[in-house]
Amino acid sequence: NDCYLEFNQEENADNVLLNPSTGFRNGELERGYLQGKKLTLHNDIFKNDALVFFILKSSEITIKSNSNPHELKFSFEGFPQFGIWAPVGAPFVCLEPWAGVCDEAGYNGEFKDRFATVEVEPNHLYLCSYSMEGK
């Protein structure tokens, strides 16, 4: 429990639950999963698959350690969703800004009608970016 994620804004975000055997959304939310600015990383945090947040106030997440002064700041803009995951027992964590999410199990509709699909009108731009800075 040495490492943690620090968000640059106070959060009150729901975790979108996934079915770990299929990777699909199961239609349920873990309400208020992320509270405040700190999320402690521990061995079981990803046992049920990724943490998926549809709405974050933050535009920066920093990986920090209680025992080491080094840190990695991950900045992002224009991404509506965010995923955080790691294989169980892995010595790393993946921070992924997303523009769209996986379907709920059993979805048979059109691609254009999928939940969280980003639509860009003709002659318009959709801009998003991310950067990383190590210290």
Report residues per predicted region.
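Extended aliphatic helical segments
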Residues: 16, 52, 88, 93, ...
